[in-house]
Amino acid sequence: MGFYQGPDNRKITGGLKGKHRDKRKYEIGNPSTLTTLSAEDIRTKDRTLGGNFKVRLKYTTTANVLDPATNTAKKVKILEVLETPANKELARRGIIIRGAKIRTEAGLAVVTSRPGQDGVINAVLLKNESQGS
């Protein structure tokens, strides 16, 4: 079943509007990716408009974590998802999105990339709580 993101044919009162055109291909959407932790990395490659591609990260084990103190990045294992400011239900289900706070082997970090669209998890190590593993 497709995800239609165009205008609906209902008025605020609930009545039907007159349909003046058909649905267009650029008005279709996709379900959310909902990246979670797993034993291996699984990515899918979706074609978008203009022949471009989005790499969707379905499952992952690692993140690229930047340490702002030393300005170095390293690939470390993700241990758990602690909280998500967008929705606490996502953190309870272990779903990683942009802005989520994760516990890694290097310490606590905040995700700065969009795993469902970038295909990778980039994060920045938190200063005060880098000892918290």
UniProtKB/Swiss-Prot annotation:
Keyword annotations from UniProtKB, A to Z: Ribonucleoprotein, Ribosomal protein
Biological process, per Gene Ontology: translation
GO MF, one example: structural constituent of ribosome
Domain of life from the UniProt record: Archaea
GO CC, any one term: ribosome
Keyword NAD part of the UniProt annotation: no
Keyword Ribonucleoprotein included in the entry's annotation: yes
Family membership noted in the UniProt record: Belongs to the eukaryotic ribosomal protein eS8 family.
HAMAP family: Ribosomal_eS8
Record text on subunit structure and interactions: Part of the 30S ribosomal subunit.
Protein name (Swiss-Prot/TrEMBL): Small ribosomal subunit protein eS8
Species whose genome carries this gene: Saccharolobus islandicus (strain M.14.25 / Kamchatka #1) (Sulfolobus islandicus)
Gene symbol of the encoding locus: rps8e
